[in-house]
Curated annotation (Swiss-Prot):
Active site: residue positions: 57
Record GO terms (molecular function): (3R)-hydroxyacyl-[acyl-carrier-protein] dehydratase activity
GO aspect biological process, one term: fatty acid biosynthetic process
Protein name as catalogued: 3-hydroxyacyl-[acyl-carrier-protein] dehydratase FabZ
Catalytic activity from the UniProt record: a (3R)-hydroxyacyl-[ACP] = a (2E)-enoyl-[ACP] + H2O
UniProt keyword list: Cytoplasm, Lipid A biosynthesis, Lipid biosynthesis, Lipid metabolism, Lyase
Pfam family, one: FabA
Function: Involved in unsaturated fatty acids biosynthesis. Catalyzes the dehydration of short chain beta-hydroxyacyl-ACPs and long chain saturated and unsaturated beta-hydroxyacyl-ACPs.
Main location: cytoplasm
Amino acid sequence: MSHPAYELPIDVNQIQALIPHRYPFLLIDRVIELDLEAKRIVGQKNVSINEPFFQGHFPTRPVMPGVLIIEALAQAGGVMTQLGLGRDALSKLFYMVKVDNARFNKQVVPGDVLILEVQMKRLIRNMGCYYGEAKVNGEIVASAEIMCAAARE
């Protein structure tokens, strides 16, 4: 399937046409930069006090779970991969299979705008490898190397 040339920003409705994630697990609100030739994407997640995970993490001092920041990076990588391959949300699913060198440098709290910068390192057959950095106000709050693999049918 070929995609129309997306104009930036790519909004949440267009994102949902590309990846299968939905509320409450859709963790990217928009794409603000995309360079398929350079295999680079920049997404945005507006972190709201209304996020379901804040009910228990932690009620008196809400902090976005680090694993969800990594998931948000993976979803940004997924959007880029789907666009690069000309696929949509109904295509074969990719699953996160490995995370290396995850670092969490600062807490992400309600009101933060999480910027998701992802670079694809390689795509070989059914596996994609990415490096991602999540930033708030230009400061790296988390980073990781992520590997995803297409589901077997």
